[in-house]
């Protein structure tokens, strides 16, 4: 069964410096029908204005993944990390026993566009940690590139959950298939259009996938980018 989550049905929040679209309940947006999907708790699409960002704040017991689409994001945290996250980078922060961090757009004139992803961990009270890795467009072209996994295999970042995240870019007519067996999956379109087992999805759409043995995605345009979450 494939349940579509259209882009326009997402929650929306707007501040002077931040424009956000929520796939699941977050902040002031509450929808009991869309609290999470398996261990996937948050997919927020954020646009952060130049020279603005999230001031220092804390998290505990959450796996937080940031996927920058356009612009740059400056990260600082309480365990000594400081970095710039650019398109192609995947940032993973395990909050564990507690971590403070800030995320700031350092550009004076360019917004930053990103996906913020939260996954509920299968271990609580772990030592906070941070990881960041780059995946080129060629890594993702015409295939499912593993970018996050429980064991960090194939150069992916490591998360504390029985879940994997794949990134892909498909050209017109390019196809990728994935076997699910008895697992669930979520697909999130970043840009472009594709068909998922015959169903059409567009930019910003998501899809919850249950009780499907396999899925096939086919690009409908020059460069369709998406994330696939393999979930318990």
UniProtKB/Swiss-Prot annotation:
Its EC number is 1.13.11.24. InterPro entries: Pirin, Pirin_N_dom, Quercetinase_C, RmlC-like_jellyroll, RmlC_Cupin_sf. Binds 1 divalent metal cation. It catalyses: quercetin + O2 = 2-(3,4-dihydroxybenzoyloxy)-4,6-dihydroxybenzoate + CO. SUPFAM superfamilies: RmlC-like cupins. The keyword Membrane does not apply. A divalent metal cation binds at residues 57, 59, 101, 103. Keywords: Dioxygenase, Metal-binding, Oxidoreductase. The keyword Oxidoreductase applies. Disulfide bonds: none annotated. One of its GO terms (molecular function) is quercetin 2,3-dioxygenase activity. Its cofactor is a divalent metal cation. Belongs to the pirin family. Putative quercetin 2,3-dioxygenase. This is Putative quercetin 2,3-dioxygenase sll1773. It comes from Synechocystis sp. (strain ATCC 27184 / PCC 6803 / Kazusa).
């Amino acid at each position: 069964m494939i349940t579509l989550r259209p882009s326009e049905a997402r929650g929306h929040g707007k501040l002077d410096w931040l424009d956000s679209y929520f796939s699941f309940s977050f902040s002031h947006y509450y929808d009991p029908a869309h609290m999470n999907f398996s261990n996937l708790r948050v997919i927020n699409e954020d646009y952060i204005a130049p020279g603005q960002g999230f001031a220092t704040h804390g998290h505990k017991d959450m796996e937080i993944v940031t996927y920058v689409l356009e612009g740059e994001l400056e990260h600082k945290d309480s365990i000594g990390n400081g970095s710039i996250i650019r398109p192609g980078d995947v940032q993973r922060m395990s909050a564990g026993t507690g971590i403070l961090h800030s995320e700031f757009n350092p550009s004076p004139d360019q917004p930053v566009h990103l996906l913020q992803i939260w996954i509920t961990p299968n271990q609580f009270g772990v030592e906070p940690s941070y990881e960041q890795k780059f995946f080129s467009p060629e890594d993702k072209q015409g295939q499912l590139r593993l970018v996050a996994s429980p064991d960090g295999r194939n150069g992916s970042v490591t998360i504390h959950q029985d879940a994997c995240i794949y990134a892909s870019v498909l050209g017109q007519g390019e196809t990728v298939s994935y076997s699910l067996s008895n697992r669930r999956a979520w697909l999130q379109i970043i840009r472009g259009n594709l068909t998922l087992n015959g169903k059409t999805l567009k930019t910003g759409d998501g899809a919850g996938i249950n009780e499907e043995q396999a899925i096939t995605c086919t690009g409908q345009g020059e460069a369709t980018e998406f994330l696939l979450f393999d979930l318990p």
